[in-house]
Each structure stands twice: as structure tokens, then as C-alpha cells.
């Protein structure tokens, strides 16, 4: 496993931007759970969206690959609720992809950006998810 190649003695932070959309949910779950076991105290940060958004993003790719079941691909609506159930080692937090990091009350923010933010973060549940890997299982803490 590539895990053994990483010296995590000083901690480990992983970023997977725009990656998990192309994997099946069981594949993402297996990877996340294995990472939580291999890198206690580490972190994984990635972007996620709901099924509607994933379907739109993957529309061309799915058609070319002749894949019919977009529901099998990784998508998240409520990261804390859905992903916390994967492992006792996961501490899950998330913020809106656009609204979570920008103050839209600022007058310098254009109306079009506000509109995109509301569609992306609202209707499509686009979010940045942070998983903190516990040093021990919740049951033993």
C-alpha cells in the first residue's frame, strides 16, 4: 500500500480536490476508513456535492463510459450525518463550497457570484469536507 511510503510521524494532511466524484461510494468509504486507521491524528479535506450536482458534473463522462447508475458515485448531502457513520475514527465537519468561506454581505461581491453561491451551496449542497482521524476509536476515548 502507498500508505507505508508516507512518514506521518509529524502528522498527515491529505487533499483530494475534485477527485472523489469519479469513484463509487464504497470505494471512497474503503479508502477513507483505511486512511483513518493508518493515519491516526491525520486529516483529509475534499470537496463534495449532492447527487444532482454529481450527475451534472459527470454527465458527459458517464455517457462516454456508458454508465447508467449515477447514484452509485460518491455524493453527499449532509456530510456530518452521512460520513460519521463510516467509522468511529472520523470527526466530520463541512462548510459551503462558496458561502462557507466568503462574506457575501460585502458590497464588492457581485450579484452573479451571490447567485452562483446560493445555487451551488444551496440546491447542490456543494461543500468542503474535513475529516479528522481520531487517535483512538470513539468507543475507547
Model-derived regions, located:
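Alpha-helical subdomain
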Residues: 1-141
Amino acid at each position: 500500500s502507498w500508505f507505508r511510503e508516507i512518514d506521518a510521524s509529524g502528522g498527515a494532511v491529505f487533499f483530494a480536490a475534485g477527485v472523489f466524484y469519479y469513484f463509487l461510494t464504497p470505494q471512497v468509504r474503503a479508502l477513507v476508513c483505511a486512511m483513518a486507521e493508518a493515519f491516526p491524528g491525520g486529516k483529509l479535506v475534499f470537496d463534495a456535492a449532492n447527487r444532482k450536482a454529481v450527475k451534472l458534473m459527470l454527465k458527459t463522462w458517464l455517457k462516454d463510459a456508458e454508465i447508467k447508475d449515477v447514484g452509485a458515485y460518491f455524493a453527499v448531502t449532509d456530510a456530518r450525518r452521512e460520513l460519521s457513520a463510516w467509522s468511529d475514527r472520523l470527526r466530520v465537519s463541512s462548510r459551503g463550497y462558496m458561502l462557507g468561506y466568503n462574506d457575501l454581505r460585502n458590497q464588492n461581491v457581485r450579484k452573479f457570484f451571490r447567485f452562483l453561491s446560493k445555487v451551488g451551496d444551496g440546491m447542490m449542497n456543494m461543500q468542503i469536507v474535513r475529516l479528522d482521524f481520531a487517535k483512538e476509536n470513539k468507543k475507547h476515548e
